[in-house]
Amino acid sequence: MIHPSAKIHPTALVEEGAVIGEDVFIGPFCIIEGSVEIKARTVLKSHVVVRGDTVIGEDNEIYQFASIGEVNQDLKYKGEATKTIIGNSNRIREHVTIHRGTIQGCGVTSIGNNNLLMVNVHVAHDCQIKNNCILANNATLAGHVELDDFVIVGGMSAIHQFVIVGAHVMLGGGSMVSQDVPPYVMAQGNHARPFGVNLEGLKRRGFDKPTMHTIRNIYKMLYRGGKTLEEVLPEIEQIAETDSAISFFVEFFKRSTRGIIR
């Protein structure tokens, strides 16, 4: 079903059964195949390919030669029914690839709202990107990676499969990340190592000084106190009972399976 207000260039190919919403623009030489739904006011500039069971939300801008919902690169994948879901108000730049999920994972590759994926970013199967993240040019996420809100991934960085990156993390350019990165941390290197709290990012997002002070203290407990995570976690849980910003740490450590960067 194609909404009457949608504009589709004559050279674009839209397979029967696709759902194209109000005021959607599909530019020259785009290809839409499979059970695709594109919601209101989303723009596909040109040469964009969208395949499979894919839902793209409202007000997205998708630039030329992006590929969304394509068959993933997991050798175990045998054509099972899996999905790709993209939220609202994302900017997906040239040559970005976003692959559908696998049944061995959660079955869905998902991207939330207000994210910027710069040129040549790769998002592999079963990745979960939340909201307000920035992935700079040539950043690569392996399968099952999770990015929480407000993560910044520097250009040419690569994140190992199953890694979790906590909220408000900033990864410097060229980072190789093989373990989980706790919330609020700045990290860089091969392999990535922590080098402080993302204070500038927290200021921009309205964190007050007492909260930032508490976050810095948690960072010192994790990385400068000479204790293991198991030893400091009860102290962090106690602080989190009265400070919601610190609850991010507790929730993160409950999800972490690969150990944290050191």
Curated annotation (Swiss-Prot):
Reaction catalyzed: a (3R)-hydroxyacyl-[ACP] + UDP-N-acetyl-alpha-D-glucosamine = a UDP-3-O-[(3R)-3-hydroxyacyl]-N-acetyl-alpha-D-glucosamine + holo-[ACP]
Annotated EC: 2.3.1.129
Keywords (A to Z) from UniProt: Acyltransferase, Cytoplasm, Lipid A biosynthesis, Lipid biosynthesis, Lipid metabolism, Repeat, Transferase
InterPro entries: Acetyltransf_C, Acetyltransf_C_sf, Hexapep, Hexapep_transf_CS, Lipid_A_LpxA, Trimer_LpxA-like_sf
Cellular component, GO, one term: cytoplasm
Entry's Gene Ontology BP terms: lipid A biosynthetic process
Record has Amino-acid biosynthesis as a keyword: no
Chief subcellular location: cytoplasm
PROSITE patterns (UniProt xref): HEXAPEP_TRANSFERASES
Domain of life: Bacteria
Pathway: Glycolipid biosynthesis; lipid IV(A) biosynthesis; lipid IV(A) from (3R)-3-hydroxytetradecanoyl-[acyl-carrier-protein] and UDP-N-acetyl-alpha-D-glucosamine: step 1/6
GO molecular function: acyl-[acyl-carrier-protein]-UDP-N-acetylglucosamine O-acyltransferase activity
Assembly notes: Homotrimer.
Family per similarity comment: Belongs to the transferase hexapeptide repeat family. LpxA subfamily.
NCBIfam families linked: lipid_A_lpxA, PRK05289.1
Role noted for this protein: Involved in the biosynthesis of lipid A, a phosphorylated glycolipid that anchors the lipopolysaccharide to the outer membrane of the cell.
Name of the molecule in the record: Acyl-[acyl-carrier-protein]--UDP-N-acetylglucosamine O-acyltransferase
Encoding gene (name): lpxA
